[in-house]
Design a protein with these regions (language model features):
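TPR-repeat structural position
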Residues: 71, 88, 104-105, 139, ...
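Alpha-helical adaptor scaffolds
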Residues: 96, 100, 112-188, 193
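TPR/TPR-like (Sel1-like) alpha-helical repeat modules
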Residues: 186-189, 203-225
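Conserved small-residue packing positions in alpha-helical repeats and bundles
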Residues: 62-66, 95, 130, 166, ...
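Long, contiguous interaction/recruitment modules in multidomain scaffold/adaptor proteins
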Residues: 1-84, 106-109, 113-119
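Generic helix N-cap/helix-start motif at coil->alpha-helix transitions
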Residues: 8-9, 53-58, 71, 85-92, ...
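TPR/TPR-like alpha-solenoid helical repeat scaffolds
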Residues: 131-132, 159-171, 199-206, 227-247
């Protein structure tokens, strides 16, 4: 027998034993059985490496791999947790997973159901509800929720929430307010999305010179940034490059 095939069998068996002993999902056995070295590599990255190096980077990689193999896994787990125990924490978890999977209706129901009693004005819950409403194509309701959040929690700060507010007023058609909000949120926003959206709105309003300045700033900033940042922001950087070429 070829040494390569023999090594593959040994690794598959070792990973299979790990699946059974550690209580991993049984679908891993079928993946390991049919996909040889590729399956072993994926299993190592998704299930073994996080245990060896329980850092945020490892967890992020593992989650990406699991999302490709079984995209609904975390949401199903959150559903089960809520069925077993209807707690505020479990509602938040399922609401967040529903948002992540684009199930905005379910997320909105969970957030609305959680906004009561001591949590009636919880800023994180209100922001989650606004995100769900915006995802359902309800920018006015999202803006109303964000306005209520601001009124109830004047000291609350969230860059993502601020960007969402800018997007809601833009979608409603309040261009002047949207420009004002985008101009404010781009200051210190951790990424290029806010700047790209600001540039696109400036372009639509006819301010091509200012839009070009924003897109150039994005390209200059990203060129001087670390490689990981360029990878994470690749889509927004490419949008800025294309839009600048059209001006």
């Amino acid at each position: 027998m070829s040494p390569i095939i023999l090594l593959s069998i040994v690794l598959q068996i070792a990973c299979g034993v790990h699946v059974v002993r550690t209580g991993r999902p049984m679908y891993w056995l079928f993946i390991l059985l049919f996909f040889s070295y590729i399956a072993v590599l994926i299993y190592f990255i998704a299930e073994i490496l996080p245990d060896m190096r329980n850092g945020p980077g490892s967890r992020k990689v593992a989650r990406k791999v699991r999302d490709v193999i079984d995209p609904g896994r975390d949401k199903r787990r959150a559903e089960i947790n809520l069925q077993l125990s209807d707690t505020q924490a479990n509602r938040r978890e399922l609401a967040a997973e529903s948002l992540r999977h684009g199930d905005y209706q379910r997320a909105a129901e969970l957030y609305q159901g959680s906004l009561k009693g001591l949590y009636a004005t919880d800023p994180d819950l209100m922001l989650g509800l606004a995100r769900a409403q915006f995802g359902m194509g309800q920018p006015q309701q999202a803006r109303d929720t964000l306005d209520a959040l601001i009124a109830a929690n004047p000291d609350f700060r969230s860059k993502e929430g601020h960007l969402l507010y800018a997007r809601t007023v833009e979608d409603i058609g309040d261009v002047a307010a949207a420009l004002h909000e985008y101009e404010a949120v781009v200051q210190g926003y951790p990424g290029e999305e806010a700047r790209v959206r600001y540039g696109l709105l400036l372009k639509r309003t006819g301010d091509s010179r200012r839009a070009a300045d924003i897109f150039r700033e994005i390209l200059t900033r990203s060129a001087a940034s670390p490689k990981y940042y360029q990878r994470e922001q690749r889509d927004w950087i490419e949008t800025a490059r294309q839009e600048l070429s059209r001006l």
